[in-house]
Amino acid sequence: MTLFASSWKWILASGALLLALGAGAPAFAQPAISGMQSQTGPRLDFPAGLAVDGRAVYVSSSRNNAITAIDLTSKSLTVVAGTIFQQGSNDGIGDAARFNSPDGMTIVGQDLYICDTNNSDIRKLNIPSRTVTTIAGTANIAGTEDGHGTAAHFNLPTQIATDGQALYVADSGNSAIRRITLADMNVKTIAGQAGTTGKTEGNMTKSMFNGPRGIAVDKKAIYVADTGNEVIRRIDISTMETSTIAGTGEEGDKDGPAKEAQFNNPGAICTDGTALYILDADNHSVRKMDLTANTVTKLTLVNGHIGSGCALSSDGKQLYFSDTTENSVEVVDTSSGNVTTLYPPGG
């Protein structure tokens, strides 16, 4: 499967979007916005990126070009930033901000970092103030350049993860992994050869990817769903060496020893440090890789079109993901594999 910038519109149409992991701050009490209402209030339209803290699940409602929050107690949905159906790239407060198909998200403190995919840049949303600023990349200018802040360029970034000191971005259109140091917003390509596809392992000058659309990080490694290559890759943080840890490189649906397992359009991934959870989109399943035993199993099957995004609760007991057929957010018990609907309530 070839997955590169030219196929991005197909990705959006099929529902293969990414979601991201985070932890942070409370949800909001904000009126529903006209144009996003159903009979019972606001709704999601093609939910993409997810981030979760102890009080809310944040959802990038991609077709609405808005960032929303689901209160974990009341299950109510509110709009945090963006104006429904109004795409753009403006920074600003709340509904004065504009996005263009926002996707993956992660939280550091009270700041939500967002892959604003079709603007090819990275945005920061301060949750208490609802203030949106562009921290890296330049809207509507795709490129491969490293540099500080808006001097750098991305090409359809999809998912983002953090270790608290840096942001790690799956720069899908460039088939590269980028790091943004939070202290100075310096952007550096740490794996992959930006603008070139391949499947090579090795250090940052040799490794190659093909449209990576999932990324997660723990204390020792960065994990990447190398979607176009149908494999899961691991980047050692200390050496920046890339290796393949799961998948044969052929489309399939096979559990077992990690390097014998097969995937079909793996998207978002997240980790608690002991297991890696993989949204295997075209197999309609959530897969679990035991990072000690190096085995892959199915955690659960999904009836609808599984969104390519996930987020773990802080205790690792619940895995959140989106369903782009039902425009819903689902919850999987990571022990039993049982699935319930978080939003819409009663879904």
Question: Model-predicted segments: where are they?
Answer:
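Gly/Pro-rich loop segments of beta-rich domains
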Residues: 30-48, 74-101, 131-156, 186-211, ...
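Short coil/turn segments that connect the beta-strands within blades of beta-propeller domains
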Residues: 54-55, 109-110, 164-165, 219-220, ...
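Hydrophobic core register within WD40 beta-propeller blades
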Residues: 50, 105, 160, 215, ...
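Beta-strand-rich domains and repeat architectures in extracellular enzymes and scaffolds
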Residues: 39-65
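Bacterial N-terminal signal peptides that target proteins for export
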Residues: 2-14
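Bacterial N-terminal signal peptides
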Residues: 12-22
